[in-house]
Structure formats: C-alpha cells, structure tokens
Amino acid sequence: MKSFLLLLVCLTYSLDAFYLPGLAPVNFCEKEQSSNTCPNAVPLFVNKLDSDQSVIPYEYHSFDFCTVSEEDSPVENLGQVLFGERIRPSPYNISFIENKQCSFLCEKEYKSGDAEDKRRLKLLQRGMKLNYQHHWIIDNMPVSFCFTNQQQFNVCLPSFPMGCYVTPDGRPKDACVLDNRYDKPDSYYLFNHVDILVEYRDLSHDSNMFDHKVGGRVIRIKVIPRSIKHTDKNSLNCGETAVPQPISVTDENMKVLYTYSVMWKPTDVKWSSRWDYLLDSIPHTNIQWFSIMNSLVIVLFLSGMVGMILLRTLHRDIARYNQLDNEEDAQEEFGWKLVHGDVFRPPQSAMFLSVFVGTGTQLLLMSSITLAVACFGFLSPANRGSLMTFALVWYVLLSVVSGYVSARLYKTMEGLAWKTNILLTAFFVPGILFGIFFVTNLMLWAKESSAAVPFGTLVALLSLWLFLATPLTFIGSFFGFKGDRVIAPVRTNQIPRQVPEQTLYTKPLPGMLMGGILPFGCIFIQLFFILNSIWAHQVYYMFGFLALVFLILIVTCSEATILLAYFHLCAEDYHWWWRSFLTSGFTAAYLFLYCIHYFTSKLTITGTISTILYFAYTGIFVFLFFLATGTIGFFATYLFIHKIYSSVKVD
C-alpha cells in the first residue's frame, strides 16, 4: 500500500515539480529600474543544431551564422557534454519590455570564386535539406516554434528549422509547407529573419509578493522564422510581403543579411506553469494515460493468475512430498523434488554469469535511484543534463555493489579463480561500453560534430572508470569473497543426473521466447516515448509513469521466469542458472527488434555514419537492458528455488 501511494505521489510530482531543486525565477526590470538583482538585459543563448534525419549534431558556429565571442559561454555539466549540448552566447540584443522591429544583426558575404565561401554555402544547404533545427534558450526556457499540423492541432516544439528545401519536382519539404512563397523547385530557403514573441508576467504592481517594484518574469518565448531577401542594411523590409532569400552556389556574389524583431506581450500564466504549453503539445501525450492504465490492468491480472497458480500448485506439491516422506510405502520421488541432488550444481561459465549478475544489480540500483529522484522533479528537463550526470555518478558509485554481488555469487557457485572474477567485473562490461563509445566518438570527431566528446572529458571519463569505479569494485569484491558462502538447502550429488528428453515448450529457446514477450508488452508504449525523446528530440517528463512501468517490468520478469523454471524442474531439467538469466533477459531481443522497427518506420535517418551511430547506441542500450532484466529473472528464480527446496524433507 505504501509503494502504491508513493507511485501516486510520483505521478503527480512528475507533472508539476519542475522547479523543486532550487531553480529560482529571474525577475527582469525596465532599464530605469534595473539592478544586479533585477537586470534589464534578457540574454539569448544558442545551442547545438540537430536533425531527425541525421544522428550528427553540430555546434551553432559550425554553420555560417552571426556569432559573438564565446568567452562568456555557460559551463556545461557532464550530461550536457555527453549529449552534445554546446550552449553559447548570441549577438541578439533583447531588453525587457523593449519591442524591436526589423533590427539588423549581421551581414554575410559570399564570393563566387572563393572555395571557403562555397564550402560554407554547401554546408548551409545540407543543413536545410536535412532539416537541422536551432535550439535557443532564454531564461532557461527553450524558444519554441508553434504551428498547426495536418491534423489541425496546435503543436509547439522546443526547436525551429534553420531553413527549408523544395525538391526538384517542386514539392516543398518540412517548414516550406508553411508558406506558399517557398515554391521554386530545387531551392534552399534560409530563415535569416526571426520574429521573437516574449510573453511575460507583469509583477510591477504585485505588492503581495514583493516589497519593491520589479518588472516581470519571462513565461513563454515563441519564434516565427522567415526567409527575407534584404538588399541593403539601411533599407530593411521585414513585412509579410518580403521576398524570400534562396541560397544557391552560383558564379555570382551573394550577400545574406540577418535581422530580427522582438515583441513583448503580457500574460496571466504563472511562472511555475510556464512549461505546460510545451508539454501539453507533445504528440500522443494523452494516449499514454489510457495505454499505461490499460497495460497495468492486463499485466496485474496476468500476474495475479500466475501467482495463484504457482502458490496453489506449490502448496499442494510440498504437502504431498512431505506426506510421502512419512509413508513407509513411498518407493520413488517424482516431480521437481526428483532433481534435488542436482538443482544447486554450479553451472557452466559460472564466471561470466556472476559478472553479468553483478553488473545487472548495479544497473538496477542505479535505475531505481535515478527514477526515484526524477519522479519528484529533481531531474526535470528544466535542469539540463542533470539526468545523465546523476545516472553516471551513481553508476560509478554502485560499482562497489557490482563487485560484492559478483564475488558473493561466484563464491556460492564454488568458483576458485577469484582474481579473474574481480578483474572481469571491473573491466569486462565497462570495457565493452567504453570501446563502443570510443569508436563512435572517433566517427563524430571526424564529422566535427558537437556530440564528439572533447579530449579532456574523455580523460575524465576514463579516470572515473579506472581510478574510482575500479577501486570501488575491488572493495566490493573483497567483502564479497570475505563473506560466507550461501549454503544450499539440499546436498548436491557427486554424479550429475541425466536430463531426460524435453518437450517443445520446455526446451531453452521456446522458453526464452515466451518469457520475454510479456515483460516487453509492459514497456513498449513507454519505449515509444523514450525513443522519441532520444531520436525525435521531444521532451520526456513523465518519470512517474516510467517508475510504475519499471515496477511492472520487475514483477513480470520475475513471475514469468519463475513459472518457466517451475515447469523445467517438473520436467527434471535442473539447468536453471543460465536459463533464468536468459529467459527474462530475452526481453532485450524484443527491444532490439522494436528499435529496428522504429528506425525503419518512424525515423528518416539517412547516411551510413548516422545509421552506424544509431545501431551502436541502440546496441549499448539493448546490452544494458539485457543485463538488468536478466538479473531480475535470475534473483527471482534463485530465491524461488531456494525457498521451495527448503520447504521439503529430503533424506
């Protein structure tokens, strides 16, 4: 009951707790009233540009836009660096409640015979063709691009396009469909003008909140990008009838003038609710409520059935076995009791099983702690990069748990190569992850992407692994091997029992296929939204739902694996160690198939490098998910088998 109430609280706070960690509002004042605590200048920061057609993001200055000195750039945390965020100051001059109309920003000139100018123009064209998106920030709020989609719904996105492209057959793509003037075949229209609408809450007369006059707080920022062909910076025309600015690589010189307009508009929306309009416009958000509850009802119903079957059947079996032990005419054991002398026989490759279970325990605890903190709003989208930073720090700290569990399990399975176990626990899985990460980082370096982790950060990550995670693993392993071995409730025979011929449904592969489908059915809806947040750059904030799905995943993995293990034991197959891990871990195979389906049906990613990067990152995700779900099934089965063989009398 307490867990259920906690989840309800999480569901509530996941929607409204964006500013719990102390992200204080900033008050802005008019120029005459400005001070250190109430500034007049409203800085606009630019971030990376990314695309749903490419996995490779770029820094703002990689394209030939208007820039200023980057000395005053905000310091990114580790999570922001790993996600490729590069927040930089911009040349846009915005002041509180100061409207501007068609202000000149900068001028870019391209000479026909200059190879560097042609390269810059071609990069702009490539960005427009792949629909690269700006990510601007004002007062820690994303600058949003709002439009009406084909279903006549108003959608607001936390990014806006740098331009658009019209195909050679005259078909407008992406943002070109929003204006019928973008109609010239095989043309690139650069959005060199932006109309910025800033909605603010006026606090200057709110005496209940402040004992001194303040101006207001920024609530919403919306932008309308446009393409305008300016001829002279002294005679700018930003009207609705302005001619668009196509970008072409020709033998003629070309000039591009960048301009902007700013309009301030008061609103009654409170500062604490300023994210709502972005979150409410996320596609399919409302569908999630019904789908999650529907899945919850189905899964709980199936879990209840499985639980009752197991409890009633086991209760009858245990009572019958104990009754037969008291009867003098009991000639032969049968059922799962028949394999009591082999059920705790150490498996093959016990070393790798212990390493996988240790790392899986580390991942499960990290996920649990991260979700518990996130569902209360402390790792919200308003706190950029905090989710990845928090998860990575806890992954490193929980290395001590990985070492302890791996060592304790390996000792329980009568393993002798304790040094190898310690080294594999510390280096095997992290080494695979770092190897894939390093190769993908080389690809991003070659593409000069903002997602390429700088050398200093790479050294820092390597140091975290070698000088913090590894010693913690050694410490955990020391205490794991120092502890007593878990004693099995029954003795193990010296000669292994021969496993009889198995039926189709008790063979390993059919069992894994059946054991993985139910847990996957619990997560695939949430998986769609998670993949959208990663690859379609949508905001993900329903951590309360994710925590609930995580709990359901644990329950279904446990019960499905226990049920299949019971059937295998009844069929006199005692090889449950690896099978319990692989049965629930096979959920990762369905996850990988779904990621392939998502790639082919939902994404429009083009290019070999982007495809390689997508499946490399997917491979990391699937591998970690395999370890986590496999660990759930293993521990559930281990506790189940230990319990049932402790409940029967064995001579």
What positions do the PLM features span?
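Transmembrane alpha-helices of multi-pass eukaryotic membrane proteins
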Residues: 2-6, 286-300, 350-362, 382-399, ...
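Membrane-embedded alpha-helices of multi-pass membrane proteins, especially ion channels
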Residues: 10-21, 299-312, 362-378, 398-411, ...
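Soluble extramembrane domains flanking the early transmembrane region of eukaryotic membrane proteins
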Residues: 11-293
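Interhelical loop segments of eukaryotic multi-pass membrane proteins
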Residues: 25-32, 311-337, 370, 377-391, ...
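Hydrophobic alpha-helical transmembrane segments
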Residues: 229-245, 332-342, 370-374, 399-413, ...
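TerminUS-proximal long segments
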Residues: 249, 601-651
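Hydrophobic alpha-helical transmembrane segments corresponding to the first two to three helices
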Residues: 274-447, 474-483
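Cytosolic juxtamembrane regulatory segments of multi-pass membrane proteins
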Residues: 330-344, 495-511, 587-589, 651
